[in-house]
């Protein structure tokens, strides 16, 4: 048999193999290259530092049948199958792996030349764990190595062995399933001292020198840690995974070698970022085929939690395709029906597009020299709906959108209006400010307690509301109380005081509703944008006119919205709805918080501002927020149907979408769904009219009133009834 390298070259002894370790050269999965990650000891080597860490693609090894057979033999040996017991690793000699190969990505490097390993274990948002090897030479850049464990016989067998012994999780933390990277690290730790970097626990320093440790902010421990402890310190692995505040130490950790290293890493990690982008709909078939592989299905059969794992992974793979090219949203039956009627399908060629935000110059051009609008209100709303407002426009634009400023007013009239609003706000504020303590009943005291509690924890990550006092959260008992019973912790920040006072004033202004938990989340962005307590208060009052139904004591407003969303899912996504019925998830509880505070906890701060101004336009529907919810379900319906088998799993999956949502893509999808909904209603109405005029006696298709109401742009206002005696706030 021909050997891969000349016979004259000394052979190496394989000591460990990880098969199905891939290089991902491009974002496309079809370009992935499978290979072997090996530890090989050159003949004549006298120290462990001479052992080679190598990655060789399968295609390269297959040029030598003998070498390929040897690599497979070692992988089988490490799988622990009965057939592997007779294999002798000491006899497994192969040709030395290539030091580097630009065309095939193959490499080998002695342990002495390795500076660190960057370890990223499999997570709920990323199926493959990866290890990137960083050398001591800044010029050498090696590709990340992705462990496709569902295809690796040795990893699958080890997972099964652990499962039988109830040792499913690898680390002492007991928080993560065993994966191929664990095996590689454990074997490597037999030949090298691996030290976790304190400043970034995803890095393991290899045989670190004193200078390396200092630059990485790591204290040398002399190799006292067990391999499982090393792995446990990687993010997501349990104890030690969370960084702590080290001040100057962190600054030092990112200097010198680390900066050079991360700079060189930039080109390599770009590949990783690209792979996670795209839309599930644009390439579902390859993903589904991969998920149907027996090895992948077995993981789901062995571990209930793996269904969530696989669902997240399936979405991340599917998002390799370009985001903007959404597929046709109609199902086959509706597509045929619509085509028969001659409607144009909503497809990838005529998708609505997000536009640039409305700049201050463009906004000013909407008004004449008197400050009166010279374009139609609908034109302004359309522009905001598709692009949003620039930060400089929001303070004025939001007051128009919320109805504080009339659209037909002049600048002078608005100035006069603001003066009146200041008088009214101060009057309302004075009503509770001058009250004697004996005049404050239990309800009032209860409301103040609720307000203080919520204000204290509202958006404290925003600089505007950040702590000014030296004391930290949790020290409430150490703060003095003011005349209203509020701690001086709130009084340490003027903006927290204003937030508190506005909520107390609203409690006085709307006595039937009062203050209900969640309102502080609605007021906070208004105050940050307007930075005027009077204007923020009246903007909040206007906002609450449409949001009051979310906070009714009997929760009928939230129930009605969720029921309408239930009908909408049945109407638009019937296959998903059937699955939600099977999993007892038709209560759509996972949307409760999203509707209550309009995605305030699910989106990044800037995205919250953009979403709210889009929803305030009522451009397509006053309940467009329900189509935003529908768009989330539409995006994730395939993975939910295929891989989430219970209410708990669906709830967990939906909750973990927080801070991962692409708002622009979501709004485009929601708009497409609205158009599809509207056209379908029109089509059904036409069909019903034809049936009424025909003699066949067929029953018309009914559409519920709440669904028809989704086509209305009129804001739904529901007021709280009079508060019964003795009933506290919410």
UniProtKB/Swiss-Prot annotation:
Residues 434-619 form the Rab-GAP TBC domain. SUPFAM superfamilies: Ypt/Rab-GAP domain of gyp1p (SSF47923). SMART domains: TBC. It comes from the Eukaryota. InterPro entries: Rab-GAP-TBC_dom, Rab-GAP_TBC_sf, SGSM1/2_RBD. The keyword Glycoprotein does not apply. One of its GO terms (molecular function) is GTPase activator activity. Pfam families: PH_RBD, RabGAP-TBC. One of its GO terms (cellular component) is cytoplasm. Keywords: GTPase activation. Transmembrane segments: none annotated. Most effectively accelerate the intrinsic GTPase activity of YPT7. It is also active, but to a lesser extent, on YPT31, YPT32 and YPT1. YPT6 and SEC4. This is GTPase-activating protein GYP7.
């Amino acid at each position: 048999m021909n050997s891969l390298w000349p016979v004259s070259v000394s052979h190496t002894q394989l000591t460990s193999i990880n098969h199905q370790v891939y290089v991902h050269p491009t974002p496309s999965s079809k370009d992935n290259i499978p290979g072997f990650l090996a530890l090989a000891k050159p003949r004549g080597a006298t120290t462990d530092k001479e052992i080679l860490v190598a990655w060789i693609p399968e295609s390269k090894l297959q040029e030598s049948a003998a070498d390929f057979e040897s690599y497979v033999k070692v992988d089988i040996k490490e799988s622990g199958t009965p057939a592997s017991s007779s294999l002798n690793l000491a006899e497994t000699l192969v040709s030395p792996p290539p030091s580097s190969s630009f065309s095939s990505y193959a490499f080998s490097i002695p342990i002495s030349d390795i500076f660190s390993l960057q370890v990223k274990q499999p997570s709920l948002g990323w199926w493959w764990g990866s290890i990137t090897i960083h050398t001591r030479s800044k010029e050498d850049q090696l590709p990340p190595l992705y462990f496709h464990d569902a295809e690796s016989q040795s990893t699958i067998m080890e997972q099964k062995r652990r499962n039988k012994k109830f040792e499913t999780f690898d680390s002492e933390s007991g928080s993560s399933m065993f994966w191929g990277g664990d095996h590689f690290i454990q074997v490597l730790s037999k030949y090298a001292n691996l030290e976790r970097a304190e400043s970034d626990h995803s890095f393991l320093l290899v045989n670190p020198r004193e200078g390396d440790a200092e630059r990485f902010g790591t204290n040398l421990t002399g190799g006292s840690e067990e391999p499982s402890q090393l792995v446990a310190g990687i993010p997501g692995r349990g104890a030690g995974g969370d960084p702590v505040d080290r001040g100057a130490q962190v600054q030092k950790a990112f200097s010198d070698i680390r900066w050079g290293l991360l700079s060189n890493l930039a080109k390599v990690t770009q590949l990783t970022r690209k792979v996670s982008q795209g839309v599930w709909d644009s390439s579902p078939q390859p993903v589904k085929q991969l998920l149907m592989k027996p090895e992948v299905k077995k993981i789901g059969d062995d571990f209930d939690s793996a269904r969530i794992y696989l669902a997240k992974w399936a979405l991340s793979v599917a998002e390799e395709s370009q985001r903007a090219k959404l597929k046709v949203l109609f199902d086959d039956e509706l597509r045929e029906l619509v085509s028969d009627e001659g409607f144009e399908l909503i497809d990838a060629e005529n998708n609505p597009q997000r536009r640039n935000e409305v700049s201050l110059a463009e906004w000013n051009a909407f008004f004449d020299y008197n400050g009166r609008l010279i374009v139609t209100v609908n034109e302004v709303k359309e522009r905001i709906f598709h692009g949003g407002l620039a930060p400089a426009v929001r303070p004025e634009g939001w007051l128009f959108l919320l109805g504080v400023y009339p659209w037909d007013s002049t600048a002078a009239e608005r100035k006069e209006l603001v003066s009146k609003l200041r008088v009214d706000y101060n009057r309302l504020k004075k009503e509770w400010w001058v009250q004697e303590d004996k005049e404050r009943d239990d309800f009032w005291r209860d409301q103040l307690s609720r307000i203080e509690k919520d204000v204290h924890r509202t958006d404290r990550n925003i600089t505007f509301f950040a702590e000014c006092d030296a004391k930290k959260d949790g020290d409430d008992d150490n703060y003095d109380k003011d005349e209203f019973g509020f701690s001086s912790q709130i009084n340490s920040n003027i903006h927290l005081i204003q937030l508190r006072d506005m909520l107390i004033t609203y409690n006085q202004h709307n006595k039937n509703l009062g203050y209900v938990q969640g309102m502080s989340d609605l007021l906070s962005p208004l105050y940050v944008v307007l930075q005027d307590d009077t204007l923020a208060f009246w903007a909040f009052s206007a906002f609450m006119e449409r949001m009051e139904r979310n906070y009714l004591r009997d929760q009928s407003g939230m129930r009605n919205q969720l029921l309408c969303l239930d009908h909408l899912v049945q109407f638009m996504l019937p296959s998903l709805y059937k699955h939600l019925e099977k999993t007892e998830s038709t209560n759509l509880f996972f949307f409760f918080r999203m509707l209550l505070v309009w995605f305030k906890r699910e989106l990044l701060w800037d995205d919250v501002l953009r979403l709210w101004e889009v929803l305030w336009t009522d451009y397509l529907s006053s309940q467009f927020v329900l189509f935003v919810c529908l768009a989330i379900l539409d995006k994730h319906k395939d993975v939910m149907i295929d891989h989430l088998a219970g209410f708990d799993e669906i709830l967990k999956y939906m909750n973990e979408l927080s801070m991962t949502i692409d708002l622009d893509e979501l709004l485009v999808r929601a708009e497409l769904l609205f158009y599809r909904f509207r056209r379908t209603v029109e089509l059904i109405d036409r069909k019903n009219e034809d049936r009424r005029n025909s003699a066949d006696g067929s029953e018309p298709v009914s559409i519920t009133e709440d669904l028809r109401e989704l086509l209305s742009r009129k804001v739904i206002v529901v007021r709280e009834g009079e508060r019964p005696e003795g009933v506290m706030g919410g």
